[in-house]
Amino acid sequence: MARPQPNVLVNTDHGMMIVNRLDYALAPDGKSGYGVGFQLLNKGNYDPEEINLVKFLAKDMADQLDRPITMIDGGANIGVHTIEWAKYLNHRGRIVAFEAQEHIYHMLCGNAALNNCFNVKLFNAALGAEEGWLEIPKPNYNDTGSFGSMELKQHDKSEHIGQDLTKKTTVPTMAIDDFEFQHLDFLKLDVEGMEMEALAGADETIKRCKPRMLIEIIKIDRAEISGWLAERDYTAYPFAGNFIAVHKSDSMSDRITSENGVISIS
């Protein structure tokens, strides 16, 4: 019986990585594709501008603080951000990463090990408003699909990832507040429409620690999240389908601007 081999080892700009070669969906034009695996296999990297911006913001914090910084990668996928941050910061920081899809989580763990990232803590869980369990789709990883685009909570307008999602599985949900982090310096949320729920579960931590944030806004209401952030004295700066959120007490707030989605830092 044939045994498919979708996972391959790829020498990317981010280091050696386990990548699913079927991690892609075709764009509406039927010619171009998208997906984390697609970018890594066809370009050698994944969203380098976003990676470099976050690394700059992290280094800026690490330079100011007389302690290691803590960063959360919410929706880590196979770990491009996690690995880049971990290698860049080394002993100057630790990364806590969450990935809900079990098979992708296995790849995340493998990639952290391959790149000798000893300053990471990885969880196979979704981020939400509270601890619990969530039934999510279970894609076929032996077939093509943009697995990172899959919404854990499906609805009529959910993005089609390139394959039908008929099977289900159950995963734990975790709330960031339950970890009672002493410090949280940076929070990334790319959780395919569950960003507001993840923020609700991190509300007390955000109020106390005032982390810098990168929040994907493609599948959520911009006005809602802008209002939520403003109520907590954050300014949201648009950046390539995301908000960079900076608290008004942060020294970065006097240095950062955004125009037409382009971030400038003085």
Task: Cite the ranges covered by each PLM segment.
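S-adenosyl-L-methionine
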Residues: 1-174, 181, ...
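Short internal loop-to-helix segment that lines adenine-nucleotide cofactor pockets
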Residues: 35, 39-70, 135, 151-209, ...
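Hydrophobic pocket-lining residues within nucleotide cofactor-binding pockets
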Residues: 76, 127-129, 176, 191, ...
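Short, conserved active-site loop motifs that form the nucleotide-linked donor/cofactor pocket
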Residues: 93, 120, 184
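A SAM-dependent methyltransferase catalytic signature shared across enzymes that methylate proteins
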Residues: 117, 227-238
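Conserved S-adenosyl-L-methionine
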Residues: 123-125, 234-242
